Amino acid sequence: MYCTGLTNIKISDSITSINAATFFDCDRLTSVTIPEGVTNIGKSAFEDCHSLTSVTIPSSVINMDHASFYSCSKLKDISFTGTKAQWRAIIKNSKWKEFEVTYTIHCTDGDLEE
């Protein structure tokens, strides 16, 4: 684990993709803001971030790879900058999230539970 002191992240506006396992096992990470313009969240990008409670995902995201937020057991609320229809249109690969946890996705036109 290389990010032992990392507690929150605001990813640079110049980033368009979060690569596989970029923040894997950042156990103290509590919040993430992904900027508009990011289109892909890679495999296991935030897997095993056990303290993660807050994430903002932009409407520009079109793909969330396998296990992108898997085993983030404290993550219950996701802020999404697009509509419910845009959220549903995102390609979410298997096990993108922890299956035992119910998430609330806060969209611009209302909330979804998954």
Task: Report each predicted region and the residues it spans.
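Acidic/polar low-complexity surface segments
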Residues: Q86-E98
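Structural signature of tandem-repeat unit edges
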Residues: Y2-S17, D27-N40, H50-N63, S73-A89, ...
